[in-house]
Amino acid sequence: MSDTLLNPYFGEFGGMYVPEILVPVLKQLEETFVAAQNDPLFQAEFTDLLKNYAGRPTALTLCRNLTKGSKTKLYLKREDLLHGGAHKTNQVLGQALLAKRMGKTRIIAETGAGQHGVATALACAMLDLPCVIYMGAKDVERQSPNVFRMRLMGAEVIPVQKGSCSLKDACCEAMRDWAANYETTHYLIGTAAGPHPFPTMVREFQKMIGEETKRQILEKENRLPDAVIAAVGGGSNAIGMFAGFIEEKSVQLIGVEPAGKGIETGEHGAPLKHGTTGIYFGMKSPIMQTKDGQIEESYSISAGLDFPSVGPQHAYLNSIGRAEYVSITNQEALDAFQALAQHEGIIPALESSHALAYALKLIAQNPDKEQLLVVNLSGRGDKDIFTVDKILNGGN
């Protein structure tokens, strides 16, 4: 792996564990990415799209009511206001521009909650690229508004009927497609995971979240936050937020994994704290797996967090103690979802609700503590209203 331009590892995690046929493709992607990072014309086009198409910078909003009775100031980084409804749009625009630069004529992607699929579909529509989205059949059912959006923008959505019919199966199908069609096709991975250079590339295309937050909080409060908190599935919204603060040792980085129905039930999606290191999805990282090395089913009420592994940089930050990783149950996330809607008039995605729930837990544990917290509100909850309605009104 010494002949890559960038270090493919974060400590022991990461790497490029793919069929030999894909190694030259990944190296071409890395070369194109490195060249683009140093090309003022590429950067200008990317910045222009972020500003005039996606709507950056996004707001940093102070919660006026949620923290009443405490001494905490809680801010939300409003990635829900981005075009497409979530942080996914940031890095999709970057990767789609790279695909055009490489001369690729077709885009494929996997999606869980559908947000990455929507972001990919909108970028492909705007850049005139055909796209195919792989989505677990279970997720197609629970995220129907996003499926309609993708199809409306011209994407072909393929429901994956294999395995658990969820995100991990969609990832496998997309990888198979890519191995068969790599000459014409770019696989636009939706998170900061997968084989090198994806974890590094996605972080770089998401790091404006943390950079903007840092500027905005200094402007508003004249100091850095005590902690930044973000939900972790594959980990792209969290690494985008953390990237702006990793060097600021006074700022605690808190990643929130889904505890699902409770860690003790086994029905969760928390591989960082409750998995073991292995090889999956082209990388070495913590995975939920059996003693025989079979991938276990992950579970979360939130389709976007329902993933049995995690990005390698998160694994590294956890291993060196720079970031802390915790977990939140479905019920806690649902409570936070409702609390934000009722007290602040903002409907968060169920993914982001996990991060918010942990912030609310911190506040409740010590209401007299003066603290400044920032939650990355990675997406809006329009896509989740039917799921939540079903649960609150007597569904599962």
Swiss-Prot record:
Its EC number is 4.2.1.20. InterPro entries: Trp_synth_b_CS (IPR006653), Trp_synth_beta (IPR006654), Trp_synth_beta/beta-like (IPR023026), TrpB-like_PALP (IPR001926), TrpB-like_PALP_sf (IPR036052). The keyword Transmembrane helix does not apply. It catalyses: (1S,2R)-1-C-(indol-3-yl)glycerol 3-phosphate + L-serine = D-glyceraldehyde 3-phosphate + L-tryptophan + H2O. Pathway: Amino-acid biosynthesis; L-tryptophan biosynthesis; L-tryptophan from chorismate: step 5/5. Keywords: Amino-acid biosynthesis, Aromatic amino acid biosynthesis, Lyase, Pyridoxal phosphate, Tryptophan biosynthesis. The lineage of its organism: Bacteria, Pseudomonadati, Pseudomonadota, Gammaproteobacteria, Pasteurellales. Belongs to the TrpB family. GO terms for cellular component: cytoplasm. The beta subunit is responsible for the synthesis of L-tryptophan from indole and L-serine. GO terms for molecular function: tryptophan synthase activity. Coiled coil: none annotated. Tetramer of two alpha and two beta chains. It holds the Pfam family PALP. This is Tryptophan synthase beta chain. Its cofactor is pyridoxal 5'-phosphate. The modification N6-(pyridoxal phosphate)lysine is found at residue 88.
